[in-house]
């Protein structure tokens, strides 16, 4: 309901939470579609757009696309230092992915 009626920053936030809950339900493809909508149409609300990239990284990992997952998260860390909380969240996700992958792949360094 909120997502349908909201505009501006509230719409961006509503889309973020829609993507978040779809990710939590392991509906990674649908979650990425919501993230893409947010980025395409509400990128002026940078906080929510950047925060949604972390969800996208988690979605890619859920879809077993480690390369895309790490690429997205590394770019958040590298390019959006003005959002400390989001960078911290992206770093936590990236570290978790690298740790999991290091257990099954010797070419991946956990740090």
Predicted regions and their residues:
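Acidic, polar-rich low-complexity tracts and alpha-helical solenoid repeat scaffolds
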Residues: 1-111
């Amino acid at each position: 309901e909120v997502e349908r009626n909201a505009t501006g920053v509230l719409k961006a936030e509503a889309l973020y939470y829609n993507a978040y809950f779809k990710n939590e339900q392991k509906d990674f493809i649908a979650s990425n579609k919501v993230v893409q909508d947010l980025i395409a149409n509400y990128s002026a609300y940078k906080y929510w757009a950047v925060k949604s990239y972390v969800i996208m990284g988690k979605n890619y990992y859920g879809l077993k696309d480690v390369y895309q997952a790490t690429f997205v998260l590394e770019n958040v860390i590298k390019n959006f230092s003005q959002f400390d909380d989001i960078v911290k969240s992206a770093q936590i996700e990236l570290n978790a992915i690298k740790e999991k992958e290091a257990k099954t792949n010797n070419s991946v360094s956990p740090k």
